């Protein structure tokens, strides 16, 4: 998965945190690297390249909260939110619909 500690996903999550994929939890395996991480998907059927992976949020009946992640890292959820790096686009949702995507790396800031 192309996200790592340079994006604010802490090394403390190595071998401890889960992500959501197809409505199921998948454990982070190995070390969270600078710009990638790996997860164990052997229990999830038909995983495809480019499937959506949820690091924090809801997928089906499963949910991972920032508070859950903060507990794993020994911090508070506010700190995790502040650590999200500028390489991560911000997606604004209103009424369940995406209303804006802000990519801080784009020159037009659009």
Annotate the PLM regions.
Residues 1-110:
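Active-site anion/phosphate-binding pocket segments in diverse small-molecule metabolic enzymes
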């Amino acid at each position: 998965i192309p996200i790592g500690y340079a994006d604010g996903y802490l090394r403390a999550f190595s071998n401890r945190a889960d992500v959501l994929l197809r409505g199921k939890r998948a454990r982070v395996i190995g070390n969270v690297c600078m710009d990638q991480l790996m997860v164990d998907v052997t229990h999830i059927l038909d995983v495809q390249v480019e499937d959506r992976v949820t690091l924090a949020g809801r997928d089906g009946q499963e949910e991972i909260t920032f508070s859950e992640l903060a507990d794993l890292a020994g911090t508070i959820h506010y700190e995790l939110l502040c650590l999200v790096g500028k390489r991560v686009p911000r997606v604004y949702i209103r009424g369940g619909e995406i209303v804006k995507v802000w990519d801080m790396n784009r020159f037009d800031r659009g």
